[in-house]
Amino acid sequence: MSHINVEKKLNFVNKLNNVNNRVLKIENLALAYDGKRILDNINMFMERGDIITILGPNGGGKTSLVKAIAGINKNYTGNIVLAENTKISYMPQNFSISNLMPITVEYFLLNSSFKRLKKNQSIITETIELAGIGNILKNQVLEISAGQTQLLLLARCLIAEPDLIILDEPVSAMDINARAKFYDIINKIAKKRLVSILMTSHDLNSALPSSDYIICINNTIYCQGKPDEIMKNRTLNEIFSSYAAK
């Protein structure tokens, strides 16, 4: 379990609120399953409106890290500290709806938040517009494409008005055109709402143009920086050969 001194954490949260609009800081995070170390010595921070991509191979710890940040996995040591009152929305990598649930896109989007949103139609309208799903609201969820499903899940995250959205491999099932559309939408969301977006990927080519910052992990962080810094210091082949060497 995570062992955090409460007084230290509260003091740190107060500092976090006053430094560079920072929403998240991770200190010395480590995590193991069945005695096998999955993550070690993870240190990072995130500011409001940032789009950060955690890049790494399958099995490198990306999903374990974002689940820890989202509060789903608490079996870690170290500190994960969020700015006070930070709201998180999390979109898992694998999400499916039962064939026994024939529901519309509109119902799926609004059901969980209807009571909160019924007096604020502007949030609903803006979310649908930002996610670009206005033309599929009456469709059955089971009938829409993989790319449209991801946009629907993104809209469901967004409608909760979060400060931080965590996306685990959000474009893995999409073709190149759907990926470009998805990344364009998250850039608009980050700018319009000043939402911080943390996503995972194993595809550097897709991640680079859409990220403010890249963190490369394979159980630990071995490179990080702005996209141009990553590319200036390492070629694609060097980056992925270093994954394979670990």
UniProtKB/Swiss-Prot annotation:
> At which positions is ATP bound?
56-63
Which GO cellular component does the record give, naming just one?
Answer: plasma membrane
Enzyme nomenclature, EC number: 7.2.2.20
- Subunit composition? The complex is composed of two ATP-binding proteins (ZnuC), two transmembrane proteins (ZnuB) and a solute-binding protein (ZnuA).
Ligase: present as a keyword of the record?
no
Membership in a protein family: Belongs to the ABC transporter superfamily. Zinc importer (TC 3.A.1.15.5) family.
Q: What is its main location?
A: membrane
| Annotated catalysed reactions | Zn(2+)(out) + ATP(in) + H2O(in) = Zn(2+)(in) + ADP(in) + phosphate(in) + H(+)(in)
The protein's location, in the record's own words, is: Cell membrane
The primary gene name is znuC
The protein in question is named Zinc import ATP-binding protein ZnuC
Keywords on this record? ATP-binding, Cell membrane, Ion transport, Membrane, Nucleotide-binding, Translocase, Transport, Zinc, Zinc transport
**Start and end residues of each ABC transporter domain:** 24-243
The record's function comment reads:
Part of the ABC transporter complex ZnuABC involved in zinc import. Responsible for energy coupling to the transport system.
Record GO terms (molecular function): ABC-type zinc transporter activity; ATP binding; ATP hydrolysis activity
